[in-house]
């Protein structure tokens, strides 16, 4: 089992969360809420208003999200779903635990895999940086789901 940190459309209440619930993809168990220990730019970009965590540690904000425990089958599914390694890259980072469900929490922080990108258009650096993504947020950039494209 591995921990993953989701900050965008895979979070509860967001457009792609349904894939986290579909056990045909593998197992994903919600463990808690957290935020990245390091700051990163989280931008909304492209014609489909996709949230992107730019792999630029030290810039932007500590990004809020959710921590899941996933099995190997779900991890492989998510790699494919996130277009890893061409669109996003899966890297490990420390996540500060804000809330944990169940006994035996990991302590102050936990190492998680996250899908971020080091390949992006230069103008993305000038987009607004977000702390907490919500497709319906005040930014007005509603995510366009794959099934609508």
Swiss-Prot record:
Presence of the UniProt keyword Lyase in the record: yes
Protein's GO biological process:
modified amino acid catabolic process
Which InterPro entries does the protein's record reference?
AIG2-like_dom, GGACT, GGCT-like, GGCT-like_sf
Catalytic activity annotated for this protein? epsilon-(gamma-L-glutamyl)-L-lysine = 5-oxo-L-proline + L-lysine
Q: Does the keyword Lyase apply?
A: yes
Residues binding substrate? 7-10
Q: What are the protein's UniProt keywords?
A: Lyase
Q: Which domain of life does the UniProt lineage start with?
A: Eukaryota
Active site location: 82
List the Gene Ontology MF annotations in alphabetical order.
gamma-glutamylaminecyclotransferase activity
Q: Choose one Gene Ontology CC annotation of this protein and give it.
A: cytosol
Q: Name one Pfam family in it.
A: GGACT
E.C. number, please?
A: 4.3.2.8
Q: Spell out the subunit comment.
A: Monomer.
What's this protein's function?
Contributes to degradation of proteins cross-linked by transglutaminases by degrading the cross-link between a lysine and a glutamic acid residue. Catalyzes the formation of 5-oxo-L-proline from L-gamma-glutamyl-L-epsilon-lysine. Inactive with L-gamma-glutamyl-alpha-amino acid substrates such as L-gamma-glutamyl-L-alpha-cysteine and L-gamma-glutamyl-L-alpha-alanine.
Annotated family: Belongs to the gamma-glutamylcyclotransferase family.
* Protein's UniProt name: Gamma-glutamylaminecyclotransferase
Its source organism is Rattus norvegicus
């Amino acid at each position: 089992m591995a921990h993953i940190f989701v900050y965008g459309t895979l979070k509860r209440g967001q457009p792609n969360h349904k894939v986290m619930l579909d056990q045909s993809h593998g197992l994903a168990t919600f463990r808690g809420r957290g935020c990245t220990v390091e700051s990163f730019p989280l931008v909304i970009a492209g014609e489909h208003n996709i949230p992107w965590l730019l792999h630029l540690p030290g810039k932007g904000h500590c990004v809020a999200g959710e921590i899941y425990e996933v099995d190997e089958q779900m991890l492989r599914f998510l790699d494919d779903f996130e277009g890893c390694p061409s669109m996003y890259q899966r890297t490990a980072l420390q996540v500060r635990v804000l809330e944990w469900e169940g006994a035996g929490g990991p302590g102050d922080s936990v190492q998680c895999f996250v899908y971020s990108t080091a390949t992006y258009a230069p103008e993305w650096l000038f987009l607004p940086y977000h702390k907490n993504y919500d497709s319906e947020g005040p930014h007005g950039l509603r995510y366009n789901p794959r099934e609508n494209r």
